[in-house]
UniProtKB/Swiss-Prot annotation:
<keyword id="KW-0378">Hydrolase</keyword>
<keyword id="KW-0234">DNA repair</keyword>
<dbReference type="InterPro" id="IPR003180">
    <property type="entry name" value="MPG"/>
</dbReference>
<dbReference type="GO" id="GO:0006284">
    <property type="term" value="P:base-excision repair"/>
</dbReference>
<protein>
    <recommendedName>
        <fullName>Putative 3-methyladenine DNA glycosylase</fullName>
        <ecNumber>3.2.2.-</ecNumber>
    </recommendedName>
</protein>
<dbReference type="InterPro" id="IPR036995">
    <property type="entry name" value="MPG_sf"/>
</dbReference>
<keyword id="KW-0227">DNA damage</keyword>
<dbReference type="InterPro" id="IPR011034">
    <property type="entry name" value="Formyl_transferase-like_C_sf"/>
</dbReference>
<dbReference type="GO" id="GO:0003905">
    <property type="term" value="F:alkylbase DNA N-glycosylase activity"/>
</dbReference>
<dbReference type="Pfam" id="PF02245">
    <property type="entry name" value="Pur_DNA_glyco"/>
</dbReference>
<dbReference type="GO" id="GO:0003677">
    <property type="term" value="F:DNA binding"/>
</dbReference>
<comment type="similarity">
    <text>Belongs to the DNA glycosylase MPG family.</text>
</comment>
Amino acid sequence: MKLIREFYSRDTIVVAKELLGKVLVHEVNGIRTSGKIVEVEAYRGINDKGAHAYGGRRTPRTEALYGPAGHAYVYFIYGLYYCMNVVAMQEGIPEGVLIRAIEPIEGIEVMSERRFKKLFNDLTKYQLKNLTNGPSKLCSAMEIRREQNLMDLNGDELYIEEGKNESFEIVEAKRVGIDYAEEAKDYLWRFYIKGNKCVSVLKKD
């Protein structure tokens, strides 16, 4: 069952934590890939120095964040890679959740071909570990690109659905790659499923 709009229209931290264990799905050209969300980061917009919309910054790139909750915000980094966020809160409040890592469920052969141009059984241990354990890696594996920016997650192409009813421990950690964000770099707004092998960066004790 797909997540309804009201799921996303809540406090961003709550949405981030509750996205763990849910299933990200992308259906394109008759090919379905999916994966359990195992790591996320929350970004709280105007007052968050780590966020793209800090200080009320509003550009064509960040416009999706100002739109209705339950839409995709997909952006390009380093001139090479895409990252996918889920827009949260209410329209006009530019907050979102970065999907950092997934555990593949469906279409793993397709993911392998997209990431490494190899059959899944031919992947090295390193490639297996790095199939979807990062925001740009999962976008490459699931073919999430600029075309999916602003996409309604209540549609039939890119969406998130309920996962299995399972219990797990959530780890709270610092977000990755925002050392410029002054005090915001220390916020424990990265959340991941403890013990999952697909998490990108483990918390240092």
